[in-house]
């Protein structure tokens, strides 16, 4: 029997997108063939490529992020190009990543009479708040309301967002979070110490990791100012964005601010495991904050590291429930300093780290995500899938493993 083909639609070039990669590899592990139509707006990647078994076909259409309402014209042309390629492709399920691929995937699925999966990585209309005309945002909400009532499966990243879609009429919705493979965050003490020493962090120093987009809403300046008065605290800061100049200047002034530039996937785990604390900053006033369940949360849980975060979204709920970090009342320099001072206490930090690791191993890890995908795709493709082998839970000393 030929393997069932899942056609994924994506509006980035897949370099690779971490969430899309995890889901694609899981489906391949279940015996599916995964084909991916991706938009390369920078015209830099290969037109056809196979990465880890994922068959990628890129659609070239030059554009830029952040165009606002004028991006609609580029989407119209993109849809025509993708529709032509998609209809020439044999597939058994169409899997639409985010709202900007859903209308196209919905049309393809209906024309070919195949199941349609909507994978909502976030609340897309909320993400666009302030960057497109209000009428466009309202239209997107109405469009999404129409489509979520008619797709076969809605997957999203957290329970709060899943309930939000359910209240708006989604027929069948499940959570597959941005959960991490525990094995990818497994490090020995020696490996972690090697990373720390390579960065010039003393064994006795308190290392905070913050790998993110360097944007104004990520509360980076508050962290940088907070550590100035804490001589034992070091910050491993990675990413690209509009604040790169500010971060570079801060690192030049303060040798305890270690700017490592853009960080590829594997190195995120290296730095997270080598650190003592994970910092996540985001503007609570952003409409998407109420649903926030970011990668940083699951990276910290997989590595067994306490978190410092703001009081919003699913991330705050998890940190409180698991007792695995500190939820800031507000993002102010003084509040960040208080949190760091608390976590300088080895006993408190070790207890929170153990809680993070336990919660990650038992509740929010990629083994659980693969199980959900298998269950849901088995109902879409009866009798066609192999059960995933999964990951065995790792010993506490092995996951993340350095000083706490």
Which residues does each PLM region occupy?
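A short helix/loop element that forms part of the nucleotide-sugar donor recognition site in Leloir-type
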Residues: 47-49, 135-138, 186-201, 390
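A short, well-ordered alpha-helix in the C-terminal region of glycosyltransferases
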Residues: 348-363
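Carbohydrate-associated surface elements
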Residues: 160, 179
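Conserved donor-binding/catalytic core segment of Leloir-type glycosyltransferases
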Residues: 7, 202-228
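Nucleotide-activated donor-binding/catalytic signature segment of Leloir-type glycosyltransferases, i.e.
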Residues: 245-270
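Membrane-proximal helix-turn-helix segments that form the acceptor-binding/catalytic region
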Residues: 80-88, 103, 107-111, 124, ...
């Amino acid at each position: 029997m030929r393997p069932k083909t899942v056609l994924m639609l994506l509006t980035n070039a897949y370099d690779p997108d971490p969430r899309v990669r995890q889901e694609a590899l899981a489906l391949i592990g279940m015996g599916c063939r995964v084909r991916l139509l991706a938009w390369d707006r920078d015209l830099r990647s290969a037109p056809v490529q196979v990465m880890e078994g994922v068959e990628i076909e890129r659609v070239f259409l030059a554009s830029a992020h952040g165009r606002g309402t004028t991006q609609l014209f580029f989407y119209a042309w993109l849809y025509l190009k993708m529709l032509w390629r998609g209809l020439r492709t044999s597939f058994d399920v169409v899997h639409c990543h985010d709202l900007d691929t859903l209308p196209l995937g919905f049309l393809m699925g209906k024309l070919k009479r195949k199941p349609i999966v909507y994978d909502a990585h976030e609340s897309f209309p909320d993400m666009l708040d302030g960057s497109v005309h209000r009428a466009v945002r309202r239209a997107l909400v109405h469009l999404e309301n129409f489509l979520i009532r008619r797709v076969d499966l809605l997957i999203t990243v957290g329970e709060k967002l899943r309930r939000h879609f359910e209240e708006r009429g989604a027929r069948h919705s499940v959570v597959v979070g941005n959960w991490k493979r525990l094995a990818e965050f497994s490090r020995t003490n020696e490996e972690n110490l090697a990373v720390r020493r390579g960065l010039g962090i003393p064994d006795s120093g308190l290392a905070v990791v913050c790998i993110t987009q360097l944007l104004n809403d990520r509360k980076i300046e508050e962290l940088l100012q907070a550590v100035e008065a804490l001589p034992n605290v070091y910050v491993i800061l990675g990413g690209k964005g509009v604040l790169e100049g500010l971060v570079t200047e801060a690192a030049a002034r303060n040798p305890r601010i270690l700017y490592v530039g853009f960080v590829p996937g594997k190195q995120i785990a290296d730095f997270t495991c080598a650190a003592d604390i994970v910092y996540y900053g985001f503007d609570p006033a952003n409409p998407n904050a109420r649903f926030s369940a970011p990668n940083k949360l699951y990276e910290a849980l997989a590595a067994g590291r306490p978190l410092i975060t703001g009081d919003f979204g699913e991330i705050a709920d998890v940190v409180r429930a698991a007792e695995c970090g500190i939820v800031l009342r507000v993002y102010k320099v003084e509040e960040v300093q208080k949190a760091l001072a608390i976590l300088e206490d080895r006993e408190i930090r070790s207890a929170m780290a153990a809680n993070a690791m336990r919660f990650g191993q038992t509740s929010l890890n990629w083994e659980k995500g693969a199980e959900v995908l298998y269950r849901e795709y088995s109902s879409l493709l009866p009798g066609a899938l192999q059960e995933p082998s999964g990951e065995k839970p790792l010993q506490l000393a092995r996951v993340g493993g350095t000083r706490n």
